[in-house]
């Protein structure tokens, strides 16, 4: 399938770790900025916001990178075992990643994290497949062209507006509106 052409697995893992770290750093900075602003004393809002961003957003980035690295590693292992690359690999990888990251919390939390990871990845894969198929159909050169647009010359004359309305409006503002000036 064309939608699954990516880097080879050893490079994919590093690429996904870096991308996940960047997403976690940016998202964590935004999230921590709101929390720092909300919890800071009056008159110290900016200082509190920057302190929270500096101290906590890198931790969020590292946690995202750990998730991304584990997900990519499991995904690459599944590709090697199954000998094909399809959405099932990503869904199973999301579930196993959620389970492995929650393993110290007990079997109930581990099962919940596995289900949540699988459901989230299934939704992401579903949206990706629908989007790819929809865009692929739009770009298919074998499809007939869309219906021809009407030639402006064949549309006829413009209808006249009611008397007493301003006809000279600049910048593409439609004519036929009452003059408000």
UniProtKB/Swiss-Prot annotation:
Residues 137-181 are annotated as: Disordered. GO terms for molecular function: protein transmembrane transporter activity. It is found in: Mitochondrion inner membrane. It comes from the Eukaryota. The keyword Mitochondrion applies. It is a multi-pass membrane protein. One of its GO terms (cellular component) is TIM23 mitochondrial import inner membrane translocase complex. InterPro entries: Tim17 (IPR005678). The keyword Ion transport does not apply. Belongs to the Tim17/Tim22/Tim23 family. Essential component of the TIM23 complex, a complex that mediates the translocation of transit peptide-containing proteins across the mitochondrial inner membrane. This is Probable mitochondrial import inner membrane translocase subunit tim-17B.1. It comes from Caenorhabditis elegans.
